[in-house]
């Protein structure tokens, strides 16, 4: 079986139906001995460009493992579901279980109070003559 990353965008008026959609698609995968490695609900987000005169949509990310027949059935159901505005399926080399950058960005957004302060950066250089590592810390200047 192959590994795939699937992102689909749901119409914002159908946001309350997203959990039922996820359940249905998950069952389609697991019924045929497939597996879901990562499932993330990114929620309603601003679209980069309008799709069908809509400016926001509900995003879902799935990393799955399935056979080609299951994938064809899944894509077929995406195409004929009017609530799904767009979908993208990408073949991956292996399973991905770590949080996506979108989820990491939500957790690591800096507070508004700490905008003016900059953390020191650390540069590590290898001194090949002595075989030792040299560590130098630099302060970022944030003068306005």
Curated annotation (Swiss-Prot):
One GO BP annotation of this record: translation
Keyword Ribonucleoprotein: yes
Top-level lineage group: Bacteria
Region (Disordered): 95-144
Similarity field: Belongs to the bacterial ribosomal protein bS6 family.
NCBIfam families: S6
Name of this chain's protein: Small ribosomal subunit protein bS6
Functional summary from the UniProt entry: Binds together with bS18 to 16S ribosomal RNA.
A Pfam family: Ribosomal_S6
GO cellular component terms listed in the entry, alphabetical order: cytosolic small ribosomal subunit
